[in-house]
Amino acid sequence: MMYAPVEFSEAEFSRAEYQRKQQFWDSVRLALFTLAIVAIIGIAIGIVTHFVVEDDKSFYYLASFKVTNIKYKENYGIRSSREFIERSHQIERMMSRIFRHSSVGGRFIKSHVIKLSPDEQGVDILIVLIFRYPSTDSAEQIKKKIEKALYQSLKTKQLSLTINKPSFRLTPIDSKKMRNLLNSRCGIRMTSSNMPLPASSSTQRIVQGRETAMEGEWPWQASLQLIGSGHQCGASLISNTWLLTAAHCFWKNKDPTQWIATFGATITPPAVKRNVRKIILHENYHRETNENDIALVQLSTGVEFSNIVQRVCLPDSSIKLPPKTSVFVTGFGSIVDDGPIQNTLRQARVETISTDVCNRKDVYDGLITPGMLCAGFMEGKIDACKGDSGGPLVYDNHDIWYIVGIVSWGQSCALPKKPGVYTRVTKYRDWIASKTGM
């Protein structure tokens, strides 16, 4: 039996054609959707694989070598001396030049000179080198890459210092050894490679909401507290037993048994706590004029340096900061005039202001003496405030931090033409040395 062909009316034919096309495009859309899902899964797997495989970590090396075209100077043995600082910076710049434009360029992070020693041929250098490589790489494999890059640079680059190639030694070290070596130097923030500084364009005020500091960001900051009364002043750790602060912090109570010092980014709970053994005020401190507003506090027992607790460098007495130099002030003080003490450490970038400007009649009218330093902004947007007294004003020089000022006085907080006034630390280096031996 033959089947007769099915006949459609014009309307039925249009409907059937529409359904056929709809089924076709549904299939296309399903195929495209499936491909998209597969692609997304593939990309996700690729990203995960990338981060698993390319999970970088820090590798640390202790390098030693001889430099033969310079002579050893006695002050190279004093890490806070201008000679040690300048020579160290020259060596660190040279390391950067050697490695950043080499086969390991993208992997080099930074270097820190640990020691300069005398040698018959010149000067022995001991330096920590820090690199970032995939965690799957071995320290020995990386060592060979570093040595190859160095030797190639010695052949092709004109360097300011002559490295004796046979003397070069490179030893992998772990993070604990690296920290111990860096602890022998002052002014180093262990977390600085992971922690950005407050932006220089920040409009945050030290009063009215200045930026909160992270743990370990300012590891020399201390809180001086009267037992039973809480936080009174800030201070700066300059050795494992000595704090530098302001004399006016003790005008009501100079009894060391009534004071404690704590460290860390919060007052409560503190990371480290110490009793006070001795308080030394400058013999010529004048409360009426704020002259010689400087004091030393000796801890009953020394602190152990760590990522959270470190000492800041004392500047050479010859260091001069030009106007508009960026410096940082930190403390637990009020964020509004006459406001409460803050439990969390805060930070702000300010700029140095010349003594001539600060002594203008419309500013402080001649009250700024050679032992004082002005910092802030003439428009008054950032300033230290109540509770910040005694705390540090610090300056960054090639990732080494120096205390250049001690929060001392000012007219109210953050008023226009009334910047903060700090004790100028460079003027008191001899006094500090006479009391501490530093």
UniProtKB/Swiss-Prot annotation:
Record bears the keyword Transmembrane helix: yes
Ranges facing Extracellular side: 54-438
Keyword Protease among record annotations: yes
Pfam assignment, any one: SEA
Peptidase S1 domain segment(s): 206-437
Reported function: Probable serine protease.
Location in or out of the cell: Membrane
Ranges of residues in domain SEA: 57-175
PANTHER family cross-referenced by the UniProt entry: ACROSIN-RELATED (PTHR24252), SUPPRESSOR OF TUMORIGENICITY 14 PROTEIN HOMOLOG-RELATED (PTHR24252:SF17)
Gene Ontology cellular component list: cell surface; extracellular region; plasma membrane
InterPro entries in the cross-refs: Pept_S1A_HAT/DESC1, Peptidase_S1_PA, Peptidase_S1_PA_chymotrypsin, Peptidase_S1A, SEA_dom, SEA_dom_sf, Trypsin_dom, TRYPSIN_HIS
Listed EC numbers: 3.4.21.-
Topological type in the membrane: Single-pass type II membrane protein
Membrane-spanning segments: 33-53
Protein's recorded name: Transmembrane protease serine 11F
Primary localization: membrane
GO biological process, one term: proteolysis
Disulfide bonds: C233-C249, C358-C374, C385-C413
Keywords of this entry: Disulfide bond, Hydrolase, Membrane, Protease, Serine protease, Signal-anchor, Transmembrane, Transmembrane helix
One function term, GO molecular function aspect: serine-type endopeptidase activity
Lineage: superkingdom: Eukaryota
Active site, renumbered: H248, D293, S389
Family note: Belongs to the peptidase S1 family.
Gene this protein is translated from: TMPRSS11F
Membrane topology, Cytoplasmic segments: 1-32
